[in-house]
From Swiss-Prot:
<feature type="region of interest" description="Disordered">
    <location>
        <begin position="112"/>
        <end position="180"/>
    </location>
</feature>
<dbReference type="InterPro" id="IPR009092">
    <property type="entry name" value="Telokin-like_Tlp20_baculovir"/>
</dbReference>
<dbReference type="InterPro" id="IPR036731">
    <property type="entry name" value="Tlp20_sf"/>
</dbReference>
<dbReference type="Pfam" id="PF06088">
    <property type="entry name" value="TLP-20"/>
</dbReference>
<protein>
    <recommendedName>
        <fullName>Telokin-like protein 20</fullName>
    </recommendedName>
</protein>
<feature type="compositionally biased region" description="Acidic residues">
    <location>
        <begin position="156"/>
        <end position="165"/>
    </location>
</feature>
Length: 180
């Protein structure tokens, strides 16, 4: 079993709803860590259990780090108030009490920002070339083709439709050779 002689204490954070945006959870450092710098590498983050974390179990979310490090968060299987997190530090840092370590942006399905109508049709474009003599007719044809109003020229899909049988395989040179 491996032993570690230089064990640093876990980073403890509390989840709080952001005062400016209710769809953002701030994770604030609870204890003082200024006496010991956090070196490059992975550090465990202990997230205090909180009812605010329940929002992460019901909605999609994105994690945003607030420094030169990455944060990975995972939900806990049998707990809706718990969160596992780890910080991957890229450079030595000092952490202070009350500092925001990371945030999560919650994407609620009932959020009015996501209820905007989405247009599924593509915008109409006209394609002009230098040699077009009849610009309006070509533009109309290009729009019709883009909307699917014109038949595709040069392709006959019906000739490729058979009775459902697989085509006969082609013979290769190795098929005729005798094997010992």
């Amino acid at each position: 079993m491996a032993s570690m002689s230089n064990i640093t204490p876990d980073i403890i954070v509390n989840a709080q709803i952001n005062s400016e945006d209710e769809n953002v959870l701030d994770f604030i450092i609870e204890d003082e860590y200024y006496l010991k710098k956090r070196g490059v590498g992975a550090h465990i983050i202990k997230v205090a259990s909180s009812p605010q974390l329940r929002l992460l179990y019901k909605n999609a979310y994105s994690t945003v780090s607030c420094g030169n490090y990455g944060v990975l968060c995972n939900l806990v299987q049998n707990g809706e108030y718990d969160l596992n997190a780890i910080m991957f530090n890229c450079a030595e840092i000092k952490l202070n009490k009350g500092q925001m370590l990371f945030q999560t942006k919650i994407w609620r399905s009932d959020n009015s920002k996501t209820d905007a109508a989405v247009h599924t049709s593509s915008p109409k474009r006209t394609v002009e070339t230098e040699n077009d003599d009849d610009g309006e007719a070509a533009s109309a044809a290009a729009i019709d083709e883009q909307e699917g109003n014109a038949d595709v020229v040069g392709l006959d899909f019906e000739e490729n439709i058979d009775d459902g049988d697989a085509p006969t395989p082609k013979k290769q040179k190795l098929d005729n050779a005798k094997q010992d």
